[in-house]
């Protein structure tokens, strides 16, 4: 993980670790935070990746500081990459985490 990703992990963890169903797993070359066995959020190249409803993909992509999530050369619908400028405050970071947790909790547990 890059130093930026390690710093983001340290910022994410307090907002998610006390929630029921929380776990961590190495993924995407870094660390992802899981809820009930489903990938939820994590750092990636200094940005925050969040799992959201695929049906709202286009709407999410139009938000400020949001880029398509593309690890393999193909856009991953249902995921958003939030640039560092979009999570400068803890309130902004928590809001993205809360959105991802709400969505992921709607999925069947793994």
What is each model feature region?
Residues 1-110:
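Charge-dense, helix-prone N-terminal extensions
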């Amino acid at each position: 993980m890059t130093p930026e990703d390690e710093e983001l992990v340290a910022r994410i963890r307090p907002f998610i670790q006390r929630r029921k169903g929380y776990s961590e797993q190495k993924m995407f070359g870094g660390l992802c935070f899981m809820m009930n066995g489903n990938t939820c959020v994590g750092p990636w190249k200094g940005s925050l990746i969040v799992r959201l409803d695929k049906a709202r993909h286009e709407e999410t992509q139009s938000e400020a500081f949001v880029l398509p999530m593309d690890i393999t050369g193909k856009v991953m619908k249902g995921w958003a990459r939030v640039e560092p400028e979009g999570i400068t405050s803890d309130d902004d970071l928590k809001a993205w985490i809360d959105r991802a947790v709400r969505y992921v909790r709607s999925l069947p547990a793994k």
